[in-house]
């Protein structure tokens, strides 16, 4: 069956579902099994939505899932309603990102009302990702990652909470909200230090915190590095610590060439990602006579 045939079938199913909902509201249906008609309508709306998905009509699929969700709410089937709102959100992601967010928020309201905070956290991440990639609203992405982290923390899912917080820190630093980023990197780094599995990554978080300090002020960064060495002696011997000290030295001497050389050395061992490149360039711009290139 081609897409137009699938759409026609989906439209017929929608009409059937709507008839059942309408009939269930009549007086006699109320006496004789109105709720069973509504249950059937839910099922038919979902079938229509899946048929629209097969036809790649994502908006129509999303709308049909939403209708199913509203009917589930009439039946007090909260969990089924939330599932349908999530299905609607996933369909709308491909056609209308803002509507996808609206549907996911409806699902989150239901899940939090039911005390299902881990699932709510997961959907806040989905919303954050839509703001990151589709709507490019980083402030809103940050807000949803923070909310997700709060819910994960409340459920003692600290590893998942930290992943969200690290996203917040990365974006906060890009938006020049350095203190916010520092607080998170230090908090996650301190927690990682105490874990045999995670302590290797602590040096990376302290390195990033030091770079954020460096973007504020060189003396800030120097004091921060000393603090991290005392707090986590393994940091002193790390490549990250040696690198930040070389960068500090070059900056103190206002030597652009030494600074660039230190960055090149670091890049030759572990490639610079976009975030590190941005931070290192911002610091380099504070050296007199720089020509705004790291290589």
Swiss-Prot record:
Entry's Gene Ontology molecular function annotations: soluble NSF attachment protein activity; syntaxin binding
Q: Where in the cell is it found?
A: Cell membrane
Which terms are listed as keywords in the entry?
Answer: Acetylation, Cell membrane, ER-Golgi transport, Membrane, Phosphoprotein, Protein transport, Transport
Name a single GO cellular component. synaptobrevin 2-SNAP-25-syntaxin-1a complex
Q: Which Pfam families match?
A: SNAP (PF14938)
Q: Which InterPro entries does this UniProt record tie to the protein? A: NSF_attach, TPR-like_helical_dom_sf
Gene Ontology BP term (one): synaptic transmission, glutamatergic
The protein's predominant localisation is membrane
Q: Which residues carry this modification: N-acetylmethionine?
A: 1
- As stated in the Swiss-Prot or TrEMBL entry, residues carrying the post-translational modification Phosphoserine are 26, 29, 195
Query: Membrane topology for this entry?
Result: Peripheral membrane protein
Q: In which tissues is it expressed?
A: Widely expressed. Highest expression in brain.
PANTHER family given for it?
A: ALPHA-SOLUBLE NSF ATTACHMENT PROTEIN, SOLUBLE NSF ATTACHMENT PROTEIN SNAP
- Give the multimer and partner information: Interacts with PRKCABP, and disrupts the interaction between GRIA2 and PRKCABP, leading to the internalization of GRIA2. Found in a complex with VAMP8. Component of a SNARE-like complex that contains at least ZW10, USE1L, RINT1, STX18 and NAPA/SNAP-alpha. Interacts with VTI1A. Interacts with STX12. Interacts with GNA12 (via N-terminus); the interaction promotes CDH5 localization to plasma membrane.
State the family it belongs to: Belongs to the SNAP family.
What the protein does comes down to: Required for vesicular transport between the endoplasmic reticulum and the Golgi apparatus. Together with GNA12 promotes CDH5 localization to plasma membrane.
Give the protein name, as stated in the record.
Answer: Alpha-soluble NSF attachment protein
Name of the coding gene: NAPA
């Amino acid at each position: 069956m081609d897409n137009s045939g699938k759409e026609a079938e989906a439209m017929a199913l929608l009409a059937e579902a709507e008839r059942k909902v309408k009939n269930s509201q009549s007086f006699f249906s109320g006496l004789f099994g109105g709720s069973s008609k509504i249950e059937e309508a839910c099922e038919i709306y979902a079938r229509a939505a899946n048929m629209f998905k097969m036809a790649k009509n994502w908006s129509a699929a999303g709308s049909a899932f939403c209708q199913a969700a509203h009917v589930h709410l009439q039946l007090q089937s909260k969990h089924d309603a939330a599932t349908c709102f999530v299905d609607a959100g996933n369909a709308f992601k491909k056609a209308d990102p803002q509507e996808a967010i609206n549907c996911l928020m409806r699902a989150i309201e239901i899940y939090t009302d039911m005390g299902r905070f881990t699932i709510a956290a997961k959907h806040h991440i989905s919303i954050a990702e839509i703001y990151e990639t589709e709507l490019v609203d980083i402030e809103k992405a940050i807000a949803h990652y923070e909310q997700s982290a709060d819910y994960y923390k409340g459920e003692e899912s600290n590893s998942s909470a930290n992943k969200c917080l690290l996203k917040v820190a990365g974006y906060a630093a890009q938006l020049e909200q350095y203190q916010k980023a520092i607080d998170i990197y230090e908090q996650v780094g301190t927690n990682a230090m105490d874990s045999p599995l995670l302590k290797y990554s602590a040096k990376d978080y302290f390195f990033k915190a030091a770079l954020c300090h460096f973007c504020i002020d060189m003396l800030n960064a120097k004091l921060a590095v000393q603090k991290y060495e005392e707090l986590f002696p393994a940091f002193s011997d790390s490549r990250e610590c040696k690198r930040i000290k070389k960068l500090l030295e070059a900056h103190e001497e206002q030597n652009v060439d030494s600074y660039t050389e230190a960055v090149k050395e670091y890049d030759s061992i572990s490639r610079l990602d976009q975030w590190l490149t941005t931070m290192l360039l911002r610091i380099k711009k504070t050296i007199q006579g720089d020509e705004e290139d790291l290589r």
